[in-house]
Amino acid sequence: MALAGAGFDMADFLGTISDTVRPGTARPAVMHAAELEALPAGQVHNPTTLAVAGRLPTATFELFRQTIPPGQSSDMQRHYHETVHYVIAGRGHSDIEDDKEAWAAGDFIYTPPWTWHRHYNDSATEAVEFLTIENSRLLQALGITRRQSAGLCTVAEARARFPEEPAARPGLAAQPDLEDQS
């Protein structure tokens, strides 16, 4: 399975992090923290760690616990799905297109579809913990997923690496891939 580039397939990616949800399949109503499925470091293209609550019976959204180490950040990325991060612990800021937004524990961060974004941990000593909720399962079921990672760069650098394509807007012709330029 390709983790990036032209051979990347979102179905393969999601299949590595959680079971495929089937209606009527027995799944737990409660998933304990110790049962989260950690993604191997090679599947996360940035210094964050992700653990998925993949056994929950969700058909349209995915739940992750995401950790950003002190002084680190996620990669600059964009994707067709919407994402909400609930800040469990820590403080930092996010670049979402041309906006810089500060946040702290208890806040929610919304990332609209197909917007360049990167999340930063502003502490030199404390990790950031997010509960990340994204509707990627729904878009996968509809066959319209797409992700791009520009690596550890600015929004301007990401835009230069990935010029806008008219068909790359959600709701138009899908081009499933993950193009990693890290």
Each language-model region and where it sits:
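Short, low-complexity cationic-aromatic patches
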Residues: 54-58, 74-81, 100-101, 115, ...
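A short hydrophobic beta-strand segment most commonly corresponding to one strand
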Residues: 60-63, 84-86, 110, 125-144
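Short, conserved beta-strand element in jelly-roll/cupin
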Residues: 65-69, 78-96, 133-136
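Short acidic-glycine-tyrosine-enriched beta hairpin
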Residues: 98-114
